[in-house]
A protein has these predicted regions:
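Intrinsically disordered regions, especially transient/low-confidence alpha-helical propensity segments
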Residues: 11-13, 80, 132
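Tryptophan-centered motif/residue detector
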Residues: 44, 83, 134-136
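Solvent-exposed helix/loop surface patches that form functional interfaces
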Residues: 25-27, 92-136
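Bacterial N-terminal signal peptides
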Residues: 8-18
Length: 136
C-alpha cells in the first residue's frame, strides 16, 4: 500500500524513452485547457527551462468543476522535475484534492537507486523510474 501511493505519482519502467522524444516547444511552454462536457474546467501548463545539459520541467494543473456556481470538485497538482543529460534525477510534487486527500513526494537519484520520500515514508526505488508527467 505504501508503494502504491508513490507509484501513482511515478511510473516504474525498465525501458526508458529518450527524454527528448517529445519535442520541447521553442517558447518553452505547453498550455492546455482541461475540458469536460464541452466546458473548460481548468488548465494544464508545463514550462521547460534548459541550461546546457540540465532540463527543469515545471507542471501546474488546476481543475475546478462547478455545479450551479458552487464548486463540486477541485484538484491541483504542481511538480518540478530535473533531468540531466536525458536522465531523470530529481522530483518534487504535490497533489491536492478537494477533500482531505493530499499527496506529496520528493525524490532524487542516488547512484544505483532513486530515493523517494512522501506521505508514506521513505522508499528506495529502481533507478529506471520515470515520473507520470504527461509530456514525455
Amino acid at each position: 500500500m505504501i508503494k502504491l501511493r508513490i507509484i501513482t505519482l511515478l511510473i516504474v519502467t525498465l525501458f526508458c524513452l529518450d527524454i527528448y522524444s517529445f519535442p520541447i516547444p521553442k517558447n518553452g511552454e505547453v498550455k492546455f485547457d482541461v475540458i469536460r462536457k464541452n466546458k473548460v474546467i481548468g488548465s494544464h501548463e508545463i514550462r521547460f527551462t534548459e541550461n546546457d545539459d540540465v532540463l527543469i520541467v515545471e507542471t501546474n494543473i488546476d481543475i475546478e468543476v462547478k455545479v450551479l456556481f458552487v464548486s463540486a470538485y477541485e484538484f491541483a497538482h504542481q511538480s518540478t522535475e530535473t533531468w540531466i543529460s536525458g536522465n531523470f534525477t530529481k522530483i518534487t510534487a504535490h497533489s491536492d484534492f478537494e477533500d482531505e486527500r493530499e499527496y506529496f513526494i520528493k525524490g532524487q537519484d542516488n547512484n544505483d537507486s532513486f530515493l523517494a520520500s512522501g506521505m508514506d515514508g521513505k522508499l528506495e526505488l529502481n533507478k529506471n523510474i520515470l515520473p507520470s508527467n504527461f509530456w514525455n
